[in-house]
């Protein structure tokens, strides 16, 4: 019998594209190359939609309007002058000055379409020095993306998102902060349910929180017209990525007039958001000078956050932006759960004010940029008993002002890209179900504490733990190895290490004296 040939599994479309594009990177840094690739994907997409609209105008008898900007803008299509179209770039791909032609095209598109102001790379292609032959080959790769092949499938969005994640992985530790892993964003969306109102991200990176919010609404049969998007981003290049990302999805967002520091140049001072989704920089140091922002309105009723770490500055900034029924879901390093001094005083006040709704410990290695342990915080301005209408379903929320839900998801992730962890759709659904059951009054379904998974603590429980929000202090663990008191162990290590340093200092002092007495004084 003839040996059966094993059929090779076909790679997903976006993976094949990535492989082809990455081979052409050469010596260009990944952090720079992403702007080249993503800009070309964006240019291909808006050119395809432009050509489709142009054809529609001709076919419907509006040929005389084919060069009128309003004829495109009315359908959220960007108007492109001839030298800015993909067809022009493709025709000139083999020219030595193709980099300059692409820069000119992007610059012209910005000038022609006000909503894209500040969105596109400025003279990026000319500056990076990618050879004309490699740039031509990359144009051929991007040309394989049929952005309009299936009107029911977000092909270009899928490719853009895939490339963002791959670039974040490629840049690795210390970089790639522009991207929050998709499964984390999905979890936040499922917990805070941003169906209707203003959504805000004070450190929006490439805009992933907004994209997943829209996907959440669409998957739950809601209307994206019911939300408005607000964001801010400090890094200019990432700000451009976000504006392109939103434009590709047809999301109208206000990301501020410029890329700017959220603390010192808030682009949305008067904003009151219904939902906040954020992944602030972890343990950001020197975020303000010692004499800056001391009496800022955002800290009203709280201590001024320390200059050494911005974690609590981010928390208070977000609290100040919430509407009276606003909810925030954000990621912080685990250090914020138990910090002492000023941080502890702010945390105590947040708990006493009934703002902290849930603390969820996440697995390590979920982020492409760091191995640091992190937690998801849910902060809610209104934990009182009330009814809300979501997607046509009435939810009766019970009073939770005196409670905080702790959850531990450290063992609930699954392997991803060999060395990373992500949440499956099933796990996200289970966690959301637990959280919403805890929030609500349901006659047929009641919340229960589950060992090694979840525990509902009251303010008295938390006060007994000296206002620590470390989940393992509350959740019961059957495996005692998991039930390690982090604070106690770290304080013990700190004490031991302090003793060792004192012993070393004494030994050094004695050794220096010996050499001095011998007439060979050592200068340090």
Residue ranges and their predicted role:
Residues 211, 240, 278-280, 312-316, ...:
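Feature representing long, continuous alpha-helical segments
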Residues 272-273, 309-311, 325-331, 356-357, ...:
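Active-site lining segments that contact anionic ligands and/or coordinate catalytic metals
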Residues 1-195, 254-267, 361-364, 382, ...:
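Non-catalytic, mostly N-terminal accessory regions of nucleic-acid modification and defense proteins
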Residues 283-304, 311, 344, 349-351, ...:
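Accessory, often C-terminal, charged low-complexity segments
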Residues 16, 23, 32-45, 239, ...:
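Conserved Class I SAM-dependent methyltransferase catalytic core
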Residues 174-278, 283-302, 313, 333-334, ...:
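Conserved S-adenosyl-L-methionine
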Residues 128, 149, 203, 231-235, ...:
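Hydrophobic alpha-helical scaffolding
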Residues 27, 287-309, 334-342, 363-369, ...:
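Short, contiguous acidic/charged loop-to-helix segments that flank catalytic cores in large enzymes
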């Amino acid at each position: 019998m003839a040996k059966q040939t094993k059929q090779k599994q076909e790679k997903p479309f976006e993976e094949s594209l990535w492989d082809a594009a990455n081979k052409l990177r050469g010596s260009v840094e990944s952090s720079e190359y992403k702007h080249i690739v993503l800009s070309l994907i964006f240019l291909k997409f808006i050119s395809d939609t432009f050509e489709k609209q142009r054809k529609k105008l001709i076919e419907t008898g509006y040929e005389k309007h084919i060069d009128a900007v309003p004829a495109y803008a009315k359908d959220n299509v960007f108007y492109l002058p001839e030298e800015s179209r993909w067809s022009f770039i493709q025709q000139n791909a083999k020219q030595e000055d193709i980099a300059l032609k692409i820069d000119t095209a992007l610059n012209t598109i910005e000038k022609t379409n006000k909503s894209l102001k500040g969105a596109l790379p400025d003279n990026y292609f000319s500056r990076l020095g990618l050879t004309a032959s490699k740039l031509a080959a990359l144009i051929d790769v991007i040309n394989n993306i049929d952005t309009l092949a299936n009107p029911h499938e977000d092909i270009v969005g899928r490719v853009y998102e895939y490339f963002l994640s791959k670039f974040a992985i490629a840049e690795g530790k210390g970089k790639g902060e522009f991207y929050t892993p998709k499964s984390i964003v999905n979890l936040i969306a499922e917990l805070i349910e941003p169906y209707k109102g203003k959504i805000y991200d004070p450190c929006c990176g490439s805009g992933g929180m907004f994209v997943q919010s829209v996907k959440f609404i669409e998957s739950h049969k809601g209307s994206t017209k019911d939300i408005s998007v607000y964001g801010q981003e400090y890094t200019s290049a990432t700000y451009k990525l976000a504006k392109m990302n939103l434009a590709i999805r047809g999301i109208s967002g206000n990301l501020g007039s410029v890329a700017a520091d959220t603390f010192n140049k808030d682009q949305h001072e008067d904003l009151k958001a219904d939902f906040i989704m954020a992944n602030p920089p972890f343990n950001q140091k020197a975020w303000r000078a010692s004499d800056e922002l001391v009496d800022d309105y955002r800290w009203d009723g709280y201590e001024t956050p320390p200059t050494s770490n911005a974690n609590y500055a981010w928390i208070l900034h977000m609290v100040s932006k919430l509407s009276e029924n606003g909810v925030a879901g954000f990621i912080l390093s685990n250090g914020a759960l138990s910090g002492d001094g000023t941080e502890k005083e702010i945390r105590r006040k947040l708990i006493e004010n009934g703002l902290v709704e849930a603390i969820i410990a996440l697995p390590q290695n979920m982020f492409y940029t760091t191995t640091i342990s992190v937690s998801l915080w849910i902060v809610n301005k209104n934990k009182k008993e009330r009814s809300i209408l979501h997607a046509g379903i009435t939810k009766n929320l019970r009073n939770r002002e005196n409670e905080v839900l702790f959850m531990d998801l450290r063992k609930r992730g699954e392997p991803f890209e060999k060395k990373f962890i992500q949440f499956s759709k099933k796990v996200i659904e289970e966690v959301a179900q637990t959280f919403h059951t805890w929030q609500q009054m349901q006659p047929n379904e009641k919340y229960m504490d589950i060992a090694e998974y979840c525990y509902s603590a009251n303010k008295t429980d938390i006060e007994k733990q000296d206002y620590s929000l470390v989940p393992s202090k509350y959740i019961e663990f059957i495996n005692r190895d998991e039930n390690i008191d982090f604070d106690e162990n770290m304080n013990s290590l700190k004490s031991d290490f302090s003793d060792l340093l004192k012993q070393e200092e004494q030994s050094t002092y004695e050794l220096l004296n010996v050499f001095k007495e011998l007439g060979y004084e050592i200068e340090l």
